[in-house]
Amino acid sequence: MNCFSCFYFHEKKKVPRDSDNSYRRNGEVTGRDNNKTHPENPKTVNEQNKNNDEDKEVTNNIAAQTFSFRELATATKNFRQECLIGEGGFGRVYKGKLEKTGMIVAVKQLDRNGLQGNKEFIVEVLMLSLLHHKHLVNLIGYCADGDQRLLVYEYMSRGSLEDHLLDLTPDQIPLDWDTRIRIALGAAMGLEYLHDKANPPVIYRDLKAANILLDGEFNAKLSDFGLAKLGPVGDKQHVSSRVMGTYGYCAPEYQRTGQLTTKSDVYSFGVVLLELITGRRVIDTTRPKDEQNLVTWAQPVFKEPSRFPELADPSLEGVFPEKALNQAVAVAAMCLQEEATVRPLMSDVVTALGFLGTAPDGSISVPHYDDPPQPSDETSVEDSVAAEERERAVAEAMEWGVASRAHSRNPSAS
């Protein structure tokens, strides 16, 4: 059954933009017109009021818990600075405690003139109300009082992956190899659920380190669904969309054409996996010019497997299984293929990563998957060869994982 069929959206007037392309640089969308309203422009105010009424009609049909603005102001001590735990182009995030239940939550207060508008607000509430998975952040509820727009999430005590990988303070301990693979696997499983289990499929469209939240045990959950879109259904191969996302993470074909597929998310995942392997930001202007773009810098290394260890984050200090690192780099390279059709499915990625953890307790588990669909007669020779190469790499990763775990159980056998 289509889980989105019970919601009806009014067609809204599209607001003209200065540019057809929008990106987030350093976590923020660029190229967008904030379209601030002014009292001296009654038409704009009337249109905003009309949109607010339409938004209320949609949100009234959503089953998520509703909060009053007063309740959330109380929970966050009137949005005090001491409760602030994050901010960006969309607004601010506060840590709060719900008075009625005592639950600790994260409250995202959207900037009314910011980068996440009413449409993105509704998309996020809708998506997270209908999609439930252990690797998606849990939406507790929302507030749509007047022109206030707030989202209430479960509180993730470790913050974001960005906090622990790319914004380390001098006293922070770098993530070890197993934790990095655990985080990568969690994010991959979240994407796999969106692509393969949701009906219709959902394209996340904004995967990045800042949107991967971590609980106390460093389990990863995807957050911020304001840019998510329903994927193609039936005979359609893609959906067309105005280019949105974060600079450096967008798939090249989506950037060029605006044509969006689940393989666009696979590319973004490849970027995040490469960040986990290297400890580098995808775009870092503080580095030498030829190293500022992470993917461009890594591409020559992808062609020489003997050089894969060069990509390892120096903060790991060599403490990682070299073959597991090589397989992780191979997975990242496949995800970052220029041609979208030869990138792996997220189910392939989940399988491969599930065998690259080295924890003795086997805490990184791999769920059961159905057999992948067989290629049609119309599949090109190039696609078939690429699929075989992908399957071979996944098989090698699985073989390595089995051997590694067997060795950890019986080291004297080697």
From Swiss-Prot:
It is found in: Cell membrane. It is an enzyme of class 2 (transferase). ATP binds at I85, G86, E87, G88, G89, F90, G91, R92, V93, K108. GO terms for cellular component: plasma membrane. Its EC number is 2.7.11.1. It catalyses: L-seryl-[protein] + ATP = O-phospho-L-seryl-[protein] + ADP + H(+); L-threonyl-[protein] + ATP = O-phospho-L-threonyl-[protein] + ADP + H(+). Residues 79-356 form the Protein kinase domain. The active site is at D206 (proton acceptor). The modification Phosphoserine is found at S240. The modification Phosphothreonine is found at T246. Belongs to the protein kinase superfamily. Ser/Thr protein kinase family. May be involved in plant defense signaling. This is Probable serine/threonine-protein kinase PBL26. It comes from Arabidopsis thaliana (Mouse-ear cress). The gene is PBL26.
